[in-house]
A protein has these predicted regions:
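N-terminal Rossmann-like NAD(P)+-binding subdomain of aldehyde/semialdehyde dehydrogenases
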Residues: 1-111
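Conserved small-residue-rich beta-alpha loop and adjacent elements
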Residues: 104-139
Length: 139
């Protein structure tokens, strides 16, 4: 069991069940299954989803910031700034992402090389959580 504790007050917040080995394997399997369908989705679907997430963050900015403040001890101003950075990030990738995924052609000694961006699949990362929302956006 994990319990969120407000570092400023010591007050207990939400509680979360820890995953056992089977729970971890099930979560990884769900991530892999989601990847298989996501990797063949249309770019328009992806950009619409990113825009929708940005809109949801915008609509819930104060709540998200207050949650980060309670769970991490961040100042409210810092938490709001992080949420706003995430909104900008989602909107940036919705607008510019399709261009980033275009094939890249380069001259080579033997002619030309065309690079294609291919999905990697689920990424498991151990990262510091001083910017919890941004961690999800930047990956």
């Amino acid at each position: 069991m994990f319990t969120s504790i407000n570092p400023a007050t010591g007050e207990e917040g939400a509680r979360f069940e820890a995953l056992d080995d089977d729970g971890i394997e099930a979560a990884l399997a769900r991530a892999e299954a989601a990847f298989r369908s996501w990797r063949v989705s249309e770019i328009a679907q992806r950009t619409a989803l990113l825009t929708g997430i940005a809109d949801a963050f915008e609509a819930n900015k104060q709540h998200l910031a207050e949650t980060a403040t309670k769970e991490m001890g961040k100042t409210l101003a810092s938490a709001v700034a992080e949420v706003e950075k995430c909104i900008a990030g989602f909107r940036h990738y919705a607008a510019k992402g399709p261009g980033y995924l275009e094939p890249v052609e380069t001259k080579a000694a033997s002619g030309r090389v065309v690079g294609h961006w291919l999905p990697l699949g689920p990424v498991l990362a151990v990262m510091p959580w001083n910017f919890p929302y941004w961690q999800a956006v930047r990956w």
